């Protein structure tokens, strides 16, 4: 399949897939990149420059969300029950275009650029697959996210981490029983737990 700006924009927008079901949309390698599947649906590639240098990681999320798209736009997706509601199609298209440009100009930079098209971002699963495969070691790592509050044509950069993440944690609240006439001697675990939530 020939890679073009039109294909990137339309294919990623019109054919969204959720989490682990991205087998349908192929990330083409028509600009000389060998790609590797990561856990079935993620995609990894490397662009080598003209000599030894730093390793930079560029990452984009590729999943759609399980939300029905209800608009009547011409670019409405073809897959029922899912849509790129969080801009992941634009993230994917941006990384594909970066790959295309860097591939054409690899004789103008040194080092390696690693491309990570990450799956399962919304459930905190996909990144671990790239990490466990040893694919995200490097000197710097960059990712982007669209923001509707930033004017078109502008870019906002923040030092350090600035995106949300999926984190799992468990809290154990231990109570202590007491007689009903001396509640001050006990610990009401239900009250403590509800205070944490609120």
Question: Which residue stretches match the model-derived regions?
Answer:
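Acidic/His- and Gly-rich active-site-bordering loop/insert found
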Residues: 1-84, 93-109
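Histidine/acidic-residue-rich, glycine-tolerant segments that coordinate divalent metal ions
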Residues: 65-67, 73-83, 90, 107-198
